[in-house]
UniProtKB/Swiss-Prot annotation:
One of its GO terms (molecular function) is snoRNA binding. The gene is l(3)07882. It comes from the Eukaryota. Residues 354-381 have a biased composition (Acidic residues). This is Nucleolar protein 14 homolog. Residues 190-221, 774-851 form a coiled coil. The keyword Coiled coil applies. Its main location: nucleus. Pfam families: Nop14 (PF04147).
Amino acid sequence: MVAKGKKASADAVYAKKTTRSANPFDNSTAQSSKRGNPFDVHVNKEKFKILGRICKHDRGMPGVSRAKALQKRAQTLGQQFAVKHKTNRFKDNRIGKHLSGDQLTESVMNARYLAEKMSQVRSNQKAEKFNLNDDELLTHRGQTLEEIEQYRDERSDDEELDDEALDADFTAAAHFGGEGDSAQDRQAAIDEMIVEQKRRKNEIAKEKDEVYDLTEKLDANYKLLLPLVAKVTKDEQDAKPPPDAYDKLLKEMIFEPRGSVADKLINPDELAKQEAARLEKLENERLRRMRADGEEDEEASVAKPKHRSADDLDDGYFLAGEDDEGDDTLAYDLDGNLGTHLNGKKEAVLKGDENEDDDDKEGEEEEEEDSDEESDSEVDNLSDLKESESESEPEEAPKASKKKAKKSADTIPASLDTSIPFTIKMPKTYEDFTELLSKHATAQKAIIIERIIKCNHPKLEGVNRENVVKLYSFLLQYLKDLFEDASEQDIREHFQLLSKLMPYLYELTQLNPERMSNTLLEVIKEKYEEFRKNHKMYPSLDTLVYFKLVANLYSTSDFRHPVVTPCFIFIQHVLSRSRVRTRQEISMGLFLVTVVLEFVSQSKRLVPAVFNFLQGIVHMSIPKRDVEQLEITPPFERDGPLSKLLALPANTESTKLEPQQLQPTDLVTQTITPDFKVRALDTSLLLIKEALQLVEEHVGACYLAQPFLALLSRLPLESYPEHVHQHHKDATELAEKLAAQKMKPLAPAEKKPKALRLLEPRFEAVYDDKRRPKMSKAKEERAKLLHKIKREKKGAIREIRRDTSFVQMLRLKQTLQSDKERHEKVKRIYQEASVQQGELNELSRAKKKKKF
């Protein structure tokens, strides 16, 4: 029941609903009580009404604006004025507040404690300075002096230790006497003396043998060096005849710089712009082909056979004047030093008499090659490349001196024909071609090829197009015959010939790119069919030479290339399927790894076979017990003798070996020696560092670097030379850096919202009839800037003036408030004093009444 005169809650709800829906046509909302005062609106009148002009400040509400400004100042300046001269926060002013926990030494703690005590003494009253009844306990690191445990030895120095008795050895040596048999003791002493004498004689004989062996070795080395030293001395003593005036003039004319022919109708600035545009176009084309954006049709690519990307120029030694792009392909320069480019300035040697020029080159330049690490990143024009006599090919460890090279050039067999005709016809058969080359030395063979190309250039006659294709096929077959049956004695000479023929092979490729590419591709296909029949064996050495040929002749950074892509897949199949059992197979694998790294130096693609092969080489360099197994991917074996093929025995002394690269004989030798084990591991460490640098920017670089850490940590570095230690340190640091990177979560690519198709508005300049003096663009911009500065300055001065008045008002209020409080205090004091005076007067009157 509900009390009388009261409504239930349901009735109230029903009444509210009925009241709200009583008038369905009443949609007007209640007007806000805060309605603007129309008298606060200030209107700025204009003298003239101009059509089209929009005035932004024709009306305003200064009262409202002033109130908002005061409110904003109260929230900013008012708050700052209220907390002025107030310290309401804790500041750490202790000594050594910026030091961490490990850096807080005993002296810092003592200085901090002393400063705190001095501040406490200053804050207390002067009378408490001499208070001796201070109950404060002195502590050290939170402990009193009584709690600190004292480790003292309370015993005096006069006490004797319990364990100072003589031991058995001392008593047996010092005591005499006994009942032993003197004859037997004498015989034992004689036998012992005889044994000792024999041992000493054996040691002396062993030392003499070692000294004799070392002496013989030093004598042999000295005999090898003696003719070189004697020859150098003899050449230095020979006085050269002074050159006459004719020779001087001839040299000046030869080496005089020649001006480049330019079009006189084109301005040099325009020529520079055209060259910059051409280089930019080539670079964009190379990047487009690397990303495979908008691949062109095969017909369109055939229609433009002469196009070369920027990377193609680099690989072909053609882009003159460009700086090296800094690729880190493992290679060796002309001095045998490790590097990615052939540094230093290249001297431009002009071709005079070709026979004498080639002989001089053989005598003045060293021939150095590297079997598995070759660099094709030297940038130069074709003429300089043809005259260059040394390129980073397989390198020989004992370097021949310049005089020795000259001696080898001078001692040409008499059966070789040193006279080369200037016009050479194209040989009809391959037998005629080989017979022509067999009559001349290595340096002269390159000259023969050059003259055959010049005499059979396609622009001279139409039939020469087939001749250059035939010459290209002959050269490929000739390289196959050279390297297929190469031996330790002639492999160096074969690589030298390949170095000299490389620019002419490039020139032939540019004469007819389509036919030459098809010819080389057919050879690669034939080699791959042979490999498929026995994929567990490495291909022959000529196949590896073809791979290096592809790396030098074609652009390896393209996303898809008709010649490079099949070779790239072929190399990965070899590295991932062929077994590694001998010195030759290890050297071939490292050679292929270097070629692959050259392939991906620009595109930075992932090559799993390279990482697996390098892990296998490090795995074989780790000594393991017979029952110990480490995880490794085929074609490498987990256990057995092949799993530790490159491991150094414990008693091997190889710490004094000099830094050496792989030699050309490694590609044709089967026996594994300790120095080869050191060189193979050293080369692998350098290749690991380079491979990790290439994938440093990839998302999954951490997964590629982690397997190397477990293998590198197991290497026994005490058996290796110092340079191997340094290379191991560099590779380990880079692998740890990449392994520590964190993976970023996958996220869909952000798509730009598609805008609606709208008509573009047409903007027209508003004409205002204001006469302004004509100024230049720079002066007009300066005038606008000065006008804005003037307006902003006036506004800033006005705001500063208003802020000052606001602060003065706050100070006045504070002063009035303090005066009011002071007046109230004075008034209260007077009031209390008057009451007190009244009480005193009353007491004095009471005393007077008592007297009377």
